[in-house]
């Protein structure tokens, strides 16, 4: 786990005192989680009953991801191959399609988090945007995530011959980066459809006004300077 020892709660506590459990060793927490996932993979349906429901592909993907994080590479590979063997998923030939209405049923999507507009109309949007566009910037890209994107030639940014330029870190990168992360210098259509250049680098804008998108702005601006 990310946090080491943790509480294992595999029952519904009847009282607050019932929930006061000691932390278990990290190894036991991992074993417990993996046993639950392995059992689920054996008993869950191969296809979801409806969109947004968990099925075998989701469980196997979680097994693969957990083992990858824990350094169990052979187990991660085995689970990933089982996902492929289901013959339900494939990479979308158009990356942007997955972020459009027509891409809601893309075969690249293994599990969906469904949005019901009538019950929670703007919750997700609010979390992702800066306050200047009506958001809270609660969930923003980290520098670690951005650094994981390769160069256009497939090399990692710290790999010899990659051509990575720290002064221009977004130049000649995997095109999916630009389609995933909003960073300074990009054309941006903000609140009420007003276009501007997204700028989180300048604390003060031309004319002397305060830049609400500046990364240290207290007004719910992204603290990584990216959305």
Predicted segments with their positions:
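Aromatic-anchored glycine-rich loop motif in surface-exposed flexible loops
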Residues: 1-54, 70-75, 220-227
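Active-site beta-strand/loop architecture of penicillin-binding DD-peptidases
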Residues: 203-227
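An aromatic- and glycine-enriched ligand-binding surface/loop that stacks and positions planar moieties
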Residues: 30, 34, 38-41, 56-208
